Amino acid sequence: MSVTFAQGFSAAGVAAGISSVEGKKDLALVVNNGPLDAAAGVFTSNRFCAAPVQWSRKVVADGHVKAVILNSGGANACTGEAGYAQSVATAETVAGLIGAEPNDVAVCSTGLIGELLPLDNVLAGAKSAHEALAATAEAGTDASHAIMTTDTKPKTVELTGSNGWKIGGMVKGSGMIAPQLATMLCVITTDAVVSAGQMQAALAVAAEHSFNRIDVDGCMSTNDTVLLLASGASGIEPDKDEFNKLVREACASLSRQIIGDGEGASHDIRITVTGATSEDAALACGRAVAASNLLKCAISGNDPNWGRIVSSLGTVPPEVAPYDSNKVTVDVNGVRICENGGAGRDRSEVDMTPREVHIDIDLNTGSDAEATVWTDDLTHEYVHINADYES
């Protein structure tokens, strides 16, 4: 059901002729029917942020969003004033259709960078999507398909609070995924009665521990956007801790689905660093290992090459993550192949047949801070997808 799982939301996904793939659904519309229109958002940290990101940041700033329109088939990034004008025109069209103000409408785009969108197609698609709006499971599924690019499957989540309020969500993302958000568009909906301030606080923490801790290929997008919308249609004001927990669970589920659909990936790699002096230190170490293309290639070949793990680990400056390299241990899928900074058990003992590969690194500093990041292996298929990619 995706974004329509929570009460008070309708959605649609249509083929607007934006994508180069004929007949592909490429435009989604999500409308919050209230009674609340509270909203929160987090956006890309890329300095070349796209026009729709610039627009949507302003929209979300006041904590109110009545609708989100999303397109695949073009990023509308690095398109200057003309691109920004397209985002404004899109918001104005949707606002007119639903009886709202333009600054109540967020705009999201994904696809090829550097080209303007076919605006006539976008605006006509917005009208078609408005006519197709429904609060059904099928409508939510259509919306999740419409935002896909190199994704092989839609990614959705549905959760229910202890007293009946709900969270639903959808995300797109398969490649160009790196920490600090990436090329993903995510819309999460809830029918809980919550304030925009509470939502922003919950989303910021949830994103930091989910979307900001995945890395498919080390490439940061210009367009990533995560929006959390509340309709209040359940009439239920949830326990604050439970609300925060379910938002975090929703983000964790969606981010893991991105890793599970990484472009061409044959292994999902979980890297957990323990025994660090701080969580930031553990995170820096985990990200350094996750960024190693040499390691990703080795994992693709079913080779748990611990030398590539520790060499990447060693690039983290000591002032960022102090540790003694002679005390570091590395386990892969439960087998300790690096002991005290040197060889441990033979790496041929590691079972590499599961889809998930677990790399556990203990810095043994005497402290107990830890962090986990996820990444994928690097395959021939990844190169093929990105050599041939066009929106």
UniProtKB/Swiss-Prot annotation:
Binding site for substrate: 149, 172, 183, 263, 386, 391
TM annotation in the entry: none
UniProt pathway annotation: Amino-acid biosynthesis; L-arginine biosynthesis; L-ornithine and N-acetyl-L-glutamate from L-glutamate and N(2)-acetyl-L-ornithine (cyclic): step 1/1; Amino-acid biosynthesis; L-arginine biosynthesis; N(2)-acetyl-L-ornithine from L-glutamate: step 1/4
GO terms of biological process kind: L-arginine biosynthetic process; ornithine biosynthetic process
GO cellular component: cytoplasm
CDD domains: OAT (cd02152)
Marked site (Involved in the stabilization of negative charge on the oxyanion by the formation of the oxyanion hole) residue numbers: 110-111
EC identifiers of the protein: 2.3.1.35, 2.3.1.1
Site residues, Cleavage: 182-183
GO molecular function: glutamate N-acetyltransferase activity; L-glutamate N-acetyltransferase activity
Protein keywords: Acyltransferase, Amino-acid biosynthesis, Arginine biosynthesis, Autocatalytic cleavage, Cytoplasm, Multifunctional enzyme, Transferase
Enzyme class: transferase
Main location (coarse class): cytoplasm
Reactions catalysed: N(2)-acetyl-L-ornithine + L-glutamate = N-acetyl-L-glutamate + L-ornithine; L-glutamate + acetyl-CoA = N-acetyl-L-glutamate + CoA + H(+)
Subcellular location: Cytoplasm
Residues annotated as the enzyme's active site: 183
Gene3D superfamilies on file: ArgJ beta chain, C-terminal domain (3.10.20.340), L-amino peptidase D-ALA esterase/amidase (3.60.70.12)
Family to which this protein belongs: Belongs to the ArgJ family.
Subunit structure: Heterotetramer of two alpha and two beta chains.
Functional note: Catalyzes two activities which are involved in the cyclic version of arginine biosynthesis: the synthesis of N-acetylglutamate from glutamate and acetyl-CoA as the acetyl donor, and of ornithine by transacetylation between N(2)-acetylornithine and glutamate.
UniProt xrefs under PANTHER family: ARGININE BIOSYNTHESIS BIFUNCTIONAL PROTEIN ARGJ, ARGININE BIOSYNTHESIS BIFUNCTIONAL PROTEIN ARGJ, MITOCHONDRIAL
Cited HAMAP family: ArgJ
Identification of the protein by name: Arginine biosynthesis bifunctional protein ArgJ
Species name: Bifidobacterium longum (strain NCC 2705)
Name of encoding gene: argJ
